[in-house]
Amino acid sequence: NLNIGLNDHGLVSDFYFPDNAYENHTLDKNMFHKIGVRVDNKLSWLDDEGWKFSFEYFEDGLISRTTAINQSLQIKLESKDAVLYDKDALLRAVKVTNLVDYNREVAIFLHQNFAINSSKHLADTAQFIPDHPAILHYRGKRAFVVAAQILSQVSSTHHEWQSYDQHTVGLFGIENKEGSWRDAEDGELAGSNVEHGQTDSVIRFKTNLEPHQVAQIQYSIACA
């Protein structure tokens, strides 16, 4: 019941659920879910200039892979995307690689931008759910739950999956607001927990990467 469309930057631009021909929970091709990387005090979104892309599609598994390299930032980002065959959920496995020969602190921002039922009416709600933690976008009978974790080294011999360290929800398209993704530009998110109207949300992972080390993130959007 879920059909996802990706744009030329590998970003979610169509979100059909549960009817592939009718209910698209985005407004247009300019309204997509952004991904950004901040390193050396510079933030770049994948739809900014400077990224070079390659794409693969694995027909046997219905999995796509987007690889994006930014030579200026010396960062590589890879995303493998799939819709589960037995559940209405999008899964993304994101890897971010430090391409330089020294340690760096890297922040990864994942942005969600829904217009539930393709509506511009100010009726959507975005809410942080602390118990999981997760971000819930909902309106009427439609709900989308965003969850994500990063694989973190907690000791010299042990790794474990940990949740994002910051989040925020916001508004766009009213009062000259462009969306909560703008809050990421200084590297820190405000931590707003709920908004009602034309809403979006952002989560952040911050990690230290050694030379050529890879950060691994698992991300999902479950639909109901």
Positions of predicted regions on the chain:
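Polysaccharide-binding surfaces and accessory modules of carbohydrate-active proteins
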Residues: 64-69, 73-182, 201-203
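Surface-exposed coil/turn segments at beta-strand junctions on protein surfaces, enriched
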Residues: 57-59, 85, 99-101, 198, ...
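An extended acidic
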Residues: 1-69, 147-179
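Beta-strand-rich interaction surfaces with strong enrichment in secreted/lumenal proteins
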Residues: 53, 79-82, 190-194, 203-209
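Primarily extracytoplasmic ectodomains and periplasmic/lumenal surface modules that are beta-strand-rich
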Residues: 11-13, 101-105, 224
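Short Pro/Gly-enriched beta-strand edge/turn motifs at strand-loop
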Residues: 43-50, 73-78, 186-191
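Edge strands and adjacent loops of beta-rich recognition modules
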Residues: 54-65, 184, 189-197
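Short Pro-Gly-centered flexible turn/kink motifs
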Residues: 55, 104-105, 146, 207-223
